[in-house]
Amino acid sequence: FFTGANPFVLSTEKLKTLAKMVKEYYPFYKTIGCFARITDIIPKSLEELKELRTLGYDGITIGVETGDNEALTFMNKGFLAKDVLEQCRKLDEAGISYNFFYLTGIYGAGRGEVGAKKTAMLFNQLNPKIIESSMLTIYKTSELYQEIQKGNWKEESEIEKLIEL
C-alpha cells in the first residue's frame, strides 16, 4: 500500500514505473493499494485504468467524504456525487476494487441525517469493498473555522455525528 497523501494523482506512466519497481523488489506482492481522490481518477482513461489493474493496482481507498452535493461544494472538494458515480463505475469496469472514506460531521449542525441518507443512496449504487469513517476535525487555522467564526456554519454535536453514522 502506497502511503503519503494520494499517490494515484501521479500520471499513469509514473504509476506504471512504481508498479514495475514493486514487482522487481517485492515479487510476492499481488496487489498495490493507495489513497486517491475522485479528481485523480477523472483524467485516467478506462484503458489506462485497465493497464494499471494488470500491473497490480487494486484496493484503492478513495476520500469520497459524502454523497451530498451541497456539502461537497461548501467544502471545496472539486467534485460532485455524479463524479463519484461515474469514476467508480469506471474503476468497476477496469476491475479495480475500491474502498471509501466517509467523513462524519461534514454537513454541519442539523444536516447530518439528511447528508447521511444522500451518501447512502450514492454508496448503494456502487461496489465499495469497505466503507471507513472518520470524524471531521476543525483546526483554528482552517477556512472552516473562519466560517464558524463568521456564523456561516455550525459544527455538529458529537451525538449528531454518532446518529449520522
Which residue stretches match the model-derived regions?
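Short, hinge-like loop/turn segments at secondary-structure boundaries
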Residues: 51-52, 78-79, 117-119, 149-151
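Distinct, well-ordered alpha-helical segments
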Residues: 12-19, 42-52
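Conserved C-terminal portion of the radical SAM core fold
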Residues: 59, 82-144, 163-165
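Surface-exposed, active-site-proximal loop segments in enzymatic domains
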Residues: 72-75, 142-153
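Core AdoMet radical
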Residues: 1-12, 25-43, 57-84, 99, ...
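Acidic (Asp/Glu)-rich catalytic clusters
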Residues: 19-27, 49-56, 89-93
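Short linear capping/connector segments at secondary-structure termini
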Residues: 3-5, 103-106, 147-149
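C-terminal accessory regions of radical SAM enzymes
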Residues: 149-165
